[in-house]
């Protein structure tokens, strides 16, 4: 049995330090998909027998969202651009998700590892982010009683404003956590190096076919060796083999290519949050110069207005934060990012300097302009909702959209 040690701090992904001071528990999450169950909590989708869209509620066993969409499009003989969904999910899990398909047909047949729970028609299109959050049911391999032994940590998490809202390991690749390196190469214009890194990374790869590519850089021969299920890698190889190495990422679906840039932004966010935790005692404290969002009961931010903390409103904002009505945010850097002031500005400038990148690097010219990012903002902490332990060492809880269960478990287990 292969195990993933959640306690391991992926320094390489910008996550270091904890907000709690309790002891390490040495727990692990098994890599069996059945030990990590995720179910979307969608916005209301109105059924209409004459609706324009087909809505599928599907349970995916060990399927990456992007790969499933590609297979679903192929199965239904339509363009993948006609399929939308609310959020991407990790491969090593059992996930229940909703997919919206612009087609007048219903789904028929079967796909291995997919259970179609329900399908119906609707006039409501599903867009990225169209969900309240996700419910998780996670089994932890732990020799003791996790509910009892984590009680002090959970109390401290609540008192300190939640757990650090790090982007989890899944953000950086299902199996090879290197997408942030590729994203950095892309924004720096190193497109050929980025393509090579996608195909072979000596920090992760042990498969003979990847090693052979790294040694020989022979795309035509590698097309004979790379397994058929590595569809995206084979698309990159095909582009290189035809002499278009610098343009190779155009062979991927655009939303997948953009995720490389998003991964690098996520890495920068993680580093900035880690640095903030060195200087600020908890995750609910608002300091002068902070930018903030209002949040709902799921810790989902209201992005219509950024609030800036100053000496006149600081006390009020800290009171609101202590009631979980508001939270400081850290930018995901982009070419149009509004910088915070004070300590958080200093941290951001230092991280960008250390990485040798500027905000304008995220405005990508030419054929890859679609990967450009104006930036975004992410709250620094969140709390689990309705946390229960239905069985020994099994956790049942809800998190808002885009919040990683592995980041919550990391703080508990260390």
Curated annotation (Swiss-Prot):
It catalyses: uridine(13) in tRNA = pseudouridine(13) in tRNA. The keyword Lipid biosynthesis does not apply. It holds the Pfam family TruD. The active site is at residue 90. InterPro entries: PsdUridine_synth_cat_dom_sf, PsdUridine_synth_TruD, PsdUridine_synth_TruD_CS, PsdUridine_synth_TruD_insert, TruD_catalytic. It comes from the Archaea. The lineage of its organism: Archaea, Methanobacteriati, Thermoplasmatota, Thermoplasmata, Thermoplasmatales. This is Probable tRNA pseudouridine synthase D.
């Amino acid at each position: 049995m292969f195990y993933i040690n959640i306690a391991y701090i992926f320094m390489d992904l910008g996550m270091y330090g904890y907000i709690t001071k309790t002891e390490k528990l040495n727990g692990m999450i098994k890599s069996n998909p059945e030990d990590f169950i995720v179910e979307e909590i969608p916005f209301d989708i109105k059924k209409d027998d004459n609706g324009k869209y087909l809505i599928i509620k599907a349970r995916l066993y060990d399927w990456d969202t992007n790969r499933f969409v590609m297979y679903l499009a192929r199965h239904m003989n339509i363009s993948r651009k006609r399929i939308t969904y609310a959020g991407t999910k990790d491969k090593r899990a059992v996930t229940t998700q909703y997919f919206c398909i612009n087609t007048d047909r219903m789904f028929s047949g079967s796909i291995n590892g997919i259970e179609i729970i329900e399908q119906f028609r609707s006039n409501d299109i599903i867009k990225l982010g169209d969900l309240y959050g996700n419910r998780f049911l996670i089994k932890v391999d732990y020799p003791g009683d996790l509910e009892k032994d984590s009680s002090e940590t959970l109390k401290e998490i609540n008192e300190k404003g939640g757990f650090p809202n790090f982007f989890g390991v899944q953000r950086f690749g299902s199996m090879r956590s290197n997408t942030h390196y590729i994203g950095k190469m892309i924004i720096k214009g190193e497109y050929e190096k980025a393509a090579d890194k996608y195909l072979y990374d000596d920090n992760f790869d042990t498969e003979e076919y990847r090693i052979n590519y790294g040694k020989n850089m022979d795309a035509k021969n590698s097309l004979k060796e790379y397994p058929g299920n590595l569809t995206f890698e084979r698309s990159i190889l095909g582009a290189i083999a035809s002499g278009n190495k610098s343009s190779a990422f155009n062979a991927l679906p655009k939303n997948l290519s953009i995720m490389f840039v998003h991964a690098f932004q996520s890495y920068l966010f993680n580093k900035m949050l880690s640095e903030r935790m060195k200087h600020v005692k908890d995750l609910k404290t608002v300091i002068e110069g902070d930018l903030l969002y209002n949040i709902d009961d799921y810790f989902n931010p209201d992005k219509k207005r950024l609030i800036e903390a100053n000496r006149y409103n600081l006390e009020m904002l800290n009171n609101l934060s202590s009631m979980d009505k508001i939270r400081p945010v850290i930018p995901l850097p982009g070419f149009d990012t509004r910088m915070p002031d004070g300590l958080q500005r200093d941290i951001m400038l230092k991280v960008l300097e250390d990485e040798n990148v500027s905000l304008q690097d995220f405005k990508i010219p030419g054929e890859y302009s679609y990967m450009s990012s104006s930036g975004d903002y992410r709250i620094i902490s969140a709390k689990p909702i309705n946390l229960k332990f239905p069985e020994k060492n099994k956790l049942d809880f809800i998190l808002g959209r885009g919040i990683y269960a592995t980041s919550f478990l990391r703080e508990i287990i260390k």
